[in-house]
A protein has these predicted regions:
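A helix-coil-helix interface module used to build multimeric assemblies
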Residues: 1-197
Length: 197
């Protein structure tokens, strides 16, 4: 089991059910790339401000890159017993590069780190979904253009109404998806406007 950061506050071992309840690793393992990206930017800032040495920054960045490579290749797996992804990265990094890994969190609370990770993850998912929506709209528009003469009934309040083309009906969905795309763009702009770095 990965070592809990807060274990020193207790004289007895914590019940495994409490550990299971407190663990967020199953959820936040999907944020590991964003966690390491945010940590890399934070380390760079610390070095630029003279808070850590350039050598420590280089070691941290190289260590984070090696963790990312090993995760991608399957050489390293996220420890399911780790309390959260942040602890896993910190402990893995410190095991690889030594004390420089412990200096990574200078001037940054865990809450700051979590807020950044969530925002970066949501932004990444938003961009991904926007790409899927754009591709779907393109496919719908192509099919609509191919069906400009295929007649079908239009519906008003679930009742058959005037005749329309199948292409026209498809374009209604393209229009709805375009509104969804605009909502994602707006949400992403709001995420970008208040980056917690």
């Amino acid at each position: 089991m990965a070592e809990q950061l807060w274990k020193g506050r207790f004289s007895k071992a914590v019940d495994s059910r409490v550990n299971d309840f407190n663990s967020s690793i199953r959820f936040d393992q999907r944020m590991i790339a964003q966690d390491m990206r945010g940590s890399g930017v934070h380390a760079t800032m610390l070095a630029k401000q003279g808070i850590i040495s350039e050598k420590d920054c280089e070691d941290i960045l190289n260590g984070l890159a090696s963790i990312a490579e090993d995760l991608a290749s399957g050489k390293l797996e996220i420890d399911p017993n780790a309390e959260d992804v942040h602890t896993f990265v910190e402990q893995t990094l410190t095991a690889r590069i030594g004390d420089a890994g412990k200096r990574l969190h200078t001037g940054r609370s865990r809450n700051d780190q979590v807020a950044l990770d969530i925002r970066l993850t949501l932004r990444d998912y938003s961009h991904m979904l926007q790409g899927y929506i754009v591709e779907l709209i393109k496919v719908i528009c192509k099919k609509a253009a191919e069906n400009t003469t295929a007649v079908m009934p239009g519906y008003t309040h679930l009742q058959r109404a005037q005749p329309i083309t199948f292409g026209h009906a498809l374009m209604a969905y393209a229009s709805m998806l375009l509104r969804d795309l605009q909502r994602f763009e707006d949400a992403t702009a709001r995420m970008d406007a208040q980056c917690p770095l």
